Regions:
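Bacterial signal peptide processing site
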Residues: 27-29
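Canonical positions in the second alpha-helix
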Residues: 56-57, 101-102, 144-145, 219, ...
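Short coil/linker segments at helix-helix boundaries
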Residues: 31, 46-48, 76-101, 119-141, ...
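Alpha-helical segment of the N-proximal tetratricopeptide repeat
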Residues: 32-56, 60, 81, 198
């Protein structure tokens, strides 16, 4: 008697397990279907609809990491840097939260790490009250990108852009205080009333600007035709020249900066010509 009851109980357990497995399988199929629908909406720029579909995919299968990554990306696409609205802040924060959730399960996810770096950079570059803090976070996360992908030229490029952004406003303010126009081709002048102004700026910004130059060089070592890095070589060297001690040093640095401008222009023209030639030859153009 007990044997029959035991067999019946086992049969019930097996049946319940089968139902659970079928249900899990159905949920995964639902999740996949919502993912595809979300991808289609995303490709046509319907980011809000895409986010809805990705949310449904996660609801059907909470372990679906790809859907969560796509959801975060859909929210990030709806964020507009510099727009100070509650909705825009929500897009930024939701994207950030979802990318962070992705990293809890997959700490070395490159796309999530790059996206967090980008979110911090964009909000920092918007010049809000927390700009300096967010740019520092952007630097931290771009270094994490390099830790995952040492050949990531965009991360090195951004590490070069950040110190220039941080120096831009103080440099302009210093020129104004020293009665120098932005176009005046001289390093910052000593001033009896503001005797420590230049020294203070040099102590704070010289090394970060120099590090920025080195990071752009690393980006160019990865891609010698990276014209964006060339453009920031120009800006970093040109602005750092304001901290030079002599007119001779300044002139030499400005010449080097101008050389980078020319190289960037030549590279851009060469790429455009190569692309046009490829199209004319019937080939698929590449970047």
């Amino acid at each position: 008697m007990f044997g029959k009851l035991g067999m019946k109980g086992a049969a019930v357990s097996v049946a319940a397990l089968c139902v659970a497995m079928l249900s899990a399988g159905c949920n995964k199929l639902k999740a996949r279907d919502h993912l595809v629908q979300g991808e289609n909406a995303f490709k046509t720029g319907q980011y809000s609809q895409a986010a809805d579909e990705f949310n449904l995919a996660i609801a059907a299968d909470p372990t679906f990491g790809t859907a969560r990554l796509y959801l975060a990306t859909a929210y990030m696409q709806q964020y507009t840097p510099g727009t100070d609205t509650a909705e825009n802040k929500k897009f930024w924060q939701t994207a950030m939260d979802q990318f962070q959730t992705v990293l809890k399960d997959d700490p070395n996810n490159l796309l999530a790490t790059q996206s967090i770096a980008s979110l911090y950079f964009n909000v920092g570059n918007a010049k809000g009250p927390d700009s300096a803090e967010n740019l520092a976070k952007a630097e931290e996360w771009n270094r994490k990108v390099i830790g995952i992908d040492p050949k990531n030229k965009e991360a090195y490029y951004t590490l070069g852009v950040i110190p220039w952004l941080e120096f831009l406003t103080p440099d302009r303010e210093a020129r104004n205080e020293l009665h120098m126009s932005p176009e005046e081709e001289n390093p910052l002048k000593p001033d009896a009333k503001k005797s420590t102004l230049k020294a203070d700026l040099k102590a704070k910004y010289w090394q970060p600007l120099t590090d920025g130059i080195e990071n752009e060089k690393k980006a160019l070592a990865i891609d010698p035709q990276y014209e964006n890095a060339m453009s920031y070589m120009n800006l970093l060297i040109r602005y750092r020249a304001d901290l030079d001690d002599t007119k001779e040093q300044y002139t030499a640095d400005v010449k080097e900066a101008n050389d980078w401008v020319e190289k960037a222009l030549e590279t851009t023209k060469a790429k455009a010509k190569a692309k046009a030639d490829a199209i004319a030859a019937g080939a698929s153009p590449t970047e």
